[in-house]
A protein has these predicted regions:
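Substrate-binding pocket helix/loop in short-chain dehydrogenase/reductase
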Residues: 99-100, 107-112, 194, 205
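Conserved glycine-rich Rossmann-like NAD(P)H-binding loop of the short-chain dehydrogenase/reductase
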Residues: 29-46
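Residue(s) in the substrate-gating loop at a strand-loop-helix junction
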Residues: 143
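Alpha-helical segment proximal to the catalytic Tyr-Lys
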Residues: 128, 172-176, 233
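C-terminal substrate-recognition "lid" of short-chain dehydrogenase/reductases
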Residues: 120-123, 179, 213-242
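Canonical Rossmann dinucleotide-binding motif of NAD(H)/NADP(H)-dependent dehydrogenases/reductases
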Residues: 2-34
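Active-site helix of classical SDR
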Residues: 123, 159, 167
Length: 246
């Protein structure tokens, strides 16, 4: 019997990286997985196969998380397909870095839409289902950049700070309905995206980390499992940093 046996989890942006690691971790603990991405390409199809290997129900959905209407439709379909929505992980995210004075309105708007508005969209669509169930766990993927800020990432920092504020507010609004909301703030995590950085940049990052190394997607997935499961039944409105001590 796994920690999440019989539960249904929605994980956004789960075709690769941290989202994929979370979906696989949940599946290993018995959760049925509905994951979304802008398109379900070869990466998404491979993710679906890897999750299915755990013997759970899984389906990938192509959806624009930044669209309120698209999100409402996909959550309705997921509820029909799976019968419940017990866990929501808002992981969809992009970066469009640049110094503030050189940043275009389009760069700002795109990051806020995908990183922050998408979380509002999914929470708004999933909350009525969770309220009827009288239970649910919402996990927002934030970042240490949302806690400390970072030069050249004002749009990303603002979106991730917003994810923290959103989780804390939802925790207060929905706690009486048995719904918990928390945020995870990863630090430097080794993914396909960060693997493209130069050795010099990665070495500089490691110098700033007390543990002197980057984290893995599995490090983040372990915390997500804790927050999704009954192990954290009295934890809500919190931000857990997974950053090696930064």
């Amino acid at each position: 019997m796994g920690l999440l046996t019989g539960k249904t989890a929605i994980v956004t942006g789960a075709a690769r990286g941290i989202g994929k690691a979370i979906a696989l971790k949940f599946a290993a603990e018995g959760a049925n997985i509905a994951f979304t991405d802008l398109v379900i390409d070869e990466n998404g199809q491979n993710t679906e196969k890897e999750i299915a290997a755990y013997g759970v129900k899984v389906k990938g959905y192509a959806s624009n998380a930044a669209s309120f209407e698209d999100t409402a439709k996909v959550v309705e379909q997921i509820h029909k397909d799976f019968g419940s929505v017990d866990i929501l992980v808002n992981n969809a995210g992009i970066t469009k870095d640049g110094l503030m004075m050189r940043m275009s309105e389009g760069q700002w708007d795109a990051v806020i839409a995908v990183n922050l508005k998408s979380a509002f969209n999914f929470i708004h669509a999933c909350t009525p289902i969770m309220m009827r169930q009288k239970q649910g766990s919402i996990i927002n993927m934030a970042s240490v950049v949302g806690v400390h800020g970072n030069a050249g990432q004002c749009n990303y920092s603002a979106s991730k700070a917003g994810m923290i504020g959103l989780a804390k507010s939802i925790a207060q609004e929905l706690g009486s309905r048995g719904i918990r909301a928390n945020a995870i703030a990863p630090g430097f995590i080794i993914t396909e995206m960060t693997a493209k950085l130069s050795d010099e940049v990665k070495a500089e990052w490691n110098k700033r980390i007390p543990l002197r190394r980057g984290g893995t997607p599995e490090d983040v997935a372990n915390i997500a499992l804790f927050l999704a499961s009954d192990m954290s039944s009295y934890v809500s409105g919190q931000v857990i940093q997974v950053d090696g001590g930064m």
